[in-house]
C-alpha cells in the first residue's frame, strides 16, 4: 500500500495515474488563499493532494471549527480510478464535509457557481513522447487526450468570481504562452513564483496566478529555490 503522509492528513497513492509529485505539492502550498474563499475547484485532482492542502490552509485562516466551516472544494478528474482515490482520501480527512470528488471532464462541468479559487496542475509533456499507458498519457500530456492550460483559462474567464483567482503550476518555458492566453480570456497576472532546484540553475517551473482584468493589482514576482546547495 502506497501512502504519502502529510502533517495533518494522509494520501493513498495507488490508483491515480498522476502520483503525488513536487509540482502539485508546491502549488498546494504556494497558491494564494484567503479566509473568505468558499467555492474552490481543483481541475485534474488526481489523488486529491492539492485540494486537501487547500482545505487545510483555508480552514486554518478562519475562526470557525473544521466541522462548521463554510467551504466547498470540488476536485474533478476524467480518470475513474483517480476520482475514486481522491474521494477516499477526502473522506478520510478532517475536512470530509468540505470536499467532493467527481469523475468529470472540465467541459462537462455544469456547476453554475462562481469559484473563488481555481487551481490546476495540468499536463505539459510533449505529445510526441506519449506513454504506452493510456491513463498516464492523459494525465501527463497536453493534447487532445488530456487537459490543457488553455482550457483552464477559458473556463476561469467565465466561471471565476469577481475577486477570484486562478493559479497553475507550469514549466517555465510556457510563461509567455500562458500570459497571452490569460489576456485572451479577460485575465491578468497577479503573481508569479519562479521555482528553481538550486541557485545556479534557471527556473524550471512557475506558479502563475491570474485575476479578472478589471481588478486593480500590482503584479508581484517571487523566486523559490528548493535546495540551498546542489549542482
Where are these regions (language model features)?
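Conserved Class I SAM-dependent methyltransferase catalytic core
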Residues: 16, 20, 146-203
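SAM/dcSAM-binding transferase cores
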Residues: 197-231
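Residue-level signal for inorganic ion chemistry
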Residues: 27, 121, 152, 210
